[in-house]
Amino acid sequence: MFESVQGLLDEHDSIQAQLGDPAVYADQRLARKLGRRSAQLNGIVEAYHRWEGLRDDLSAAREMAAEDPEFAAEVPELEASLETAAAKLRRLLIPRDPDDARNVILEVKGGEGGDEAALFAGDLLRMYTRYAESRGWKTEIISATESDLGGYKDVQVAVKGSSNDPAEGVYARLKFEGGVHRVQRVPVTESQGRIHTSAAGVLVLPEVDEPEELEINQNDLKIDVYRSSGPGGQSVNTTDSAVRITHLPTGIVVAMQNEKSQLQNREAGMRVLRARILAHQQEQIDAANSEQRKSQIRTMDRSERIRTYNYPENRIADHRTGYKAYNLDQVMNGDLEPVIQSAIEMDEQARLDAIGD
């Protein structure tokens, strides 16, 4: 059992040796890559040694129990501990998404429902911001278009963590949030007290660590400048500070107008563009590799309804995992971990099943 781990143990030893060489840090890109891989392997190495120690302890206990019945009571306990350790190790050996350790750019856009959808988009932004705070992550609004009533027609926020451990990475925790989030409640604009249904779309993009990591040919870019506009379309700037960047090979378009200068908007736009191109490239790899199992619950498609937030019943329901709870008020205040964990566990189980096939 776990014969394949030896190769990972050898790789871990090799990486530790490299990280112990000061010369490695002259290449920061390589050092970050080695650091991320080391963090991923650390958990596997620790889990394997735990399993290996319990296996040896169980073998010794069985030998002693054969000679002295008093030791027999230890055998069932060690068997249970060994099975638990084996299950943990099996999960750690599931091939991880290569982007799990990355930070993310989270996009929330009001969908059908007009002003109410924009208000709900703002509620989702607050939910994610508070969840990020609970995990010690930092958030930064990159771009936002506010609605007349104070919500968001669309907003982009960068979420940054501090752990190199892929299992604790921002993308690993948030990547299943992409899709349509539907809300059922009485809008603030509703005078008759009727419940309305509206929606907001969420997109989660893994962020490129450094610009050099993803080379973009400047000849592949079309850059347009125009004047910024605020709620209602009124001009908020007398200079052409807003920027629209089109990546011609992929057709990806990013518009940015939050910053005061054209240069700042261009830098922010390129940051988002790199994230979108990285996600686009990964989608192409997934599509080209017929043997790679696509995630059953992660989507880059805003049109797939993934969750319903029912305010009158204080209920939240995830349509992919079957998760349901009546603590919507707590969820909207950032208590999102059980919902997210249900998606992670479903994905892990699907990956385990695929390995067993």
UniProtKB/Swiss-Prot annotation:
HAMAP family: Rel_fac_1 (MF_00093). It comes from Pseudarthrobacter chlorophenolicus (strain ATCC 700700 / DSM 12829 / CIP 107037 / JCM 12360 / KCTC 9906 / NCIMB 13794 / A6) (Arthrobacter chlorophenolicus). It is found in: Cytoplasm. Belongs to the prokaryotic/mitochondrial release factor family. This is Peptide chain release factor 1. Peptide chain release factor 1 directs the termination of translation in response to the peptide chain termination codons UAG and UAA. One of its GO terms (molecular function) is translation release factor activity, codon specific. The keyword Protein biosynthesis applies. Methylated by PrmC. Methylation increases the termination efficiency of RF1. Its main location: cytoplasm. InterPro entries: PCRF (IPR005139), Pep_chain_release_fac_I (IPR000352), Pep_chain_release_fac_I_sf (IPR045853), Prokaryotic/Mito_RF (IPR050057), RF-1 (IPR004373). Gene3D superfamilies: 3.30.160.20, 3.30.70.1660, 6.10.140.1950. GO terms for cellular component: cytoplasm. The keyword Cytoplasm applies. Keywords: Cytoplasm, Methylation, Protein biosynthesis. The modification N5-methylglutamine is found at Q234. The lineage of its organism: Bacteria, Bacillati, Actinomycetota, Actinomycetes, Micrococcales. SMART domains: PCRF (SM00937). The gene is prfA.
